[in-house]
Amino acid sequence: MSTQNDSIALLLLQITLYHQQELAHADSSLSLDELLVEPIVDNTVVEKFTSHSMVQIYAPELAPLNIRSIKGLISDLFTNTNIQEPKNLITLANHYYSERLNYLQEEKIPELIQQMKDEYRKLAE
């Protein structure tokens, strides 16, 4: 998955996780542990995800998705993400967060530092 897709996946997982916490708080008959493995995806998740500025800017093709499509994306994340620990919304979000941090530390920050050095050299000449 590309870095941009990793960021979108992380966003979807964060929105879904937050909603599961809200649902478990509002309805004591729901188990958060179960919701973390079998999340309830409803219009709230769809609306928050599809209207998010990151989706609008970096993945506009995802903006018209419906509940079924979002459920499919989440299912794909559960199926296709290769992690060692048991899969749930938290472990998946941690994985994509870690991927994002690694990208920033190993690629983006060194690239920005090099650009700053290059600009400094140009100014010093």
Curated annotation (Swiss-Prot):
Keywords for the protein's UniProt record, in alphabetical order: Activator, Chromatin regulator, Nucleus, Transcription, Transcription regulation
Top-level taxonomic group: Eukaryota
Location (main, coarse): nucleus
Gene Ontology BP terms: chromatin organization
GO cellular component: nucleus
Entry-linked InterPro entries: SWR1_Swc7
Annotated compartments: Nucleus
Oligomer and partners: Component of the SWR1 chromatin remodeling complex.
Functional note: Component of the SWR1 complex which mediates the ATP-dependent exchange of histone H2A for the H2A variant HZT1 leading to transcriptional regulation of selected genes by chromatin remodeling.
Family in the record: Belongs to the SWC7 family.
Protein's recorded name: SWR1-complex protein 7
Organism annotation: Kluyveromyces lactis (strain ATCC 8585 / CBS 2359 / DSM 70799 / NBRC 1267 / NRRL Y-1140 / WM37) (Yeast)
UniProt lineage: Eukaryota, Fungi, Dikarya, Ascomycota, Saccharomycotina
